[in-house]
């Protein structure tokens, strides 16, 4: 069994209010401790939540709580992070750079789009990706053209283009295919089909 759940703050759904406490990554410990594989949407890259490990229950960024779980050895084969919405203007900076630079996490990342969110031009900001150094101006112009024709393709190509402004690291090509580790497949066998 694999559980896909939203982590971090939720902004797309506001009907009736959203309890942001439900996006706390530390809530995943129970299913993880039971051996269930979990995909955390957006790598919990927005908002803050209570740190249950802190005696004073201080608020900590959801992203840092998620990374703590990702760095827990017993969860290495169970916890995965989805990179959907990682190019939105609210995640540019520490979350995106960290995920690009932490190559040790790449085999535990899965591609996702969070469709239809990337199709909203106001939050898909190539100017910010460019100004932070994730893409070149030429890539920015090309991505803008792609967005006008196909916003979903824009999201895919954008994730293939971005590089860390600090190290130049990119998402590995393997991230855009089947995650063999997630599905327990032999990555050396090209006949693995889900």
Locate predicted features:
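H/E-rich (His + Asp/Glu) clusters that bind or coordinate divalent metals
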Residues: 31, 37-39, 46-194
């Amino acid at each position: 069994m694999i559980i896909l759940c939203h982590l971090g703050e939720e902004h797309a759904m506001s009907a009736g209010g959203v309890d942001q406490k439900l996006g706390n990554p530390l809530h995943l410990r129970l299913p993880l401790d039971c051996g269930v594989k979990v995909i955390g949407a957006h790598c919990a890259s927005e908002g803050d939540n209570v740190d249950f490990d802190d005696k004073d229950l201080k608020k900590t960024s959801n992203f840092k709580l998620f990374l703590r779980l990702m760095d827990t050895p017993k969860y290495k084969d169970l916890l995965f992070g989805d990179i959907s919405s990682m190019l939105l203007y609210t995640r540019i900076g520490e979350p995106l750079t960290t995920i690009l630079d932490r190559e040790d996490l790449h085999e535990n990342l899965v591609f996702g789009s969070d469709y239809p969110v990337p199709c909203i031009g106001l939050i898909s900001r190539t100017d910010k990706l460019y100004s932070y150094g994730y893409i070149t101006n030429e890539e920015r112009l090309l991505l803008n053209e792609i967005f006008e024709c196909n916003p979903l393709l824009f999201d895919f190509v954008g994730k293939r283009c971005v590089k860390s402004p600090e190290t130049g690291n990119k998402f590995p090509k393997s991230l855009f295919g089947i995650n063999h580790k997630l599905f327990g497949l032999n990555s050396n066998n090209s006949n693995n089909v889900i």
